[in-house]
Amino acid sequence: YVIIVPDNLKDAVEKLSNWKKQKGYSVIVQTVEDILKSSKFKIGANQNCFDKESSVREWLKDRYKNSGAFFCLFIGDYRTSAPIRKFNISSRLTDVNSHKYTPTDAYFSDLISQWDLQKDPSGIYSCSVYSASFSPTIPVGRLLCASREEIERYTNKLILYEMFPGRG
């Protein structure tokens, strides 16, 4: 069980990590910043590590190759340093608030396919729905929290639900 968290929220996931360990999971808590400091996965370390998201994906691929199947939980949202990849959605398919980029974690769950990422004129790396694979290699979840309090609330609710499923 891998938890990827921004450095400033690492201490806030300790209770969640301990709970998962009590449930029998082997848990690794890794910060985004530590991945990016690693000589093997820092941006520019190789052709596959060209931005934060690609470096985190390469780290996940390495963990998967060396550890086998696991689950990845990202902690953080747009207010944090948590990585996110976006799809370039044609405006004729959807026009939600005129945004043509839709966030997705499919990039991090599909560790086998070669994603055709292109940098658009605004400097955003994106992928069209036609060049991406939607076949997950690992399950990926995301806890949309940006503060210690939000993480603690979620963790308390999760523990209560998992201890007493009918009452959560």
Task: Mark where each language-model region is.
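Cysteine-dependent hydrolase recognition
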Residues: 1-168
